[in-house]
């Protein structure tokens, strides 16, 4: 039943994925270039979430919403359509630190990227025996070819483009 649900979800979302890809690609050339991102680096429990929340209050900074994190390929279509339903499904706060979660709370772009590409240290959480390999390739690009790195950059740029179009 779980495999059937996964296949059904993938097939059902395919028209939205393809449509959103076509739309975002058609906008890429005429779109104002996206400024280079600012990366917030820090150790867990060091205040990075607070800094991100403070910065997100200034309109010059963009954020990755919970919907973009969960539906990065369909954020403009399914994300909008299901926003009321998804809003009800959001937890009141993050379980690890009691920080409130709202539909416009900034989230880590790395989680969205993990949903979009195989190059992410987050995959090591699901495959702990390969954690070191996922970490090194996802953080340091260790062992990746130039083509792999270019593919990751394209996915990152696609995510940021969609966030500016949404």
Protein language model features and the residues they cover:
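Phosphate-binding loop of NTP-binding sites
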Residues: 45-46, 59-60, 151, 155-157
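PAPS-dependent sulfation machinery
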Residues: 68-166
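Glycine-rich phosphate-binding P-loop
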Residues: 40-59
């Amino acid at each position: 039943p779980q495999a059937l649900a996964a296949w059904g979800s993938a097939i059902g979302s395919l028209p939205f994925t393809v449509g959103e890809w076509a739309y975002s690609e058609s906008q890429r050339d005429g779109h104002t270039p996206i400024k280079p991102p600012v990366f917030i680096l820090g150790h867990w429990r060091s205040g990075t979430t607070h800094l991100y929340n403070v910065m997100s209050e200034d309109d010059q900074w963009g954020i990755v919403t919970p919907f973009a994190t969960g539906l990065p390929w369909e954020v403009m279509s399914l994300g909008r359509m299901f926003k009321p339903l998804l809003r009800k499904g959001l937890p009141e706060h993050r379980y690890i630190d009691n920080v409130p979660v709202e539909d416009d709370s900034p989230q880590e772009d790395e989680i969205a990227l993990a949903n979009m590409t195989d190059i992410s240290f987050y995959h090591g959480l699901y495959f702990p025996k390969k954690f070191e390999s996922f970490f090194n390739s996802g953080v340091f690009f260790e062992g990746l070819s130039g083509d792999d790195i270019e593919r990751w950059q394209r996915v990152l740029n696609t995510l940021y483009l969609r966030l500016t179009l949404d």
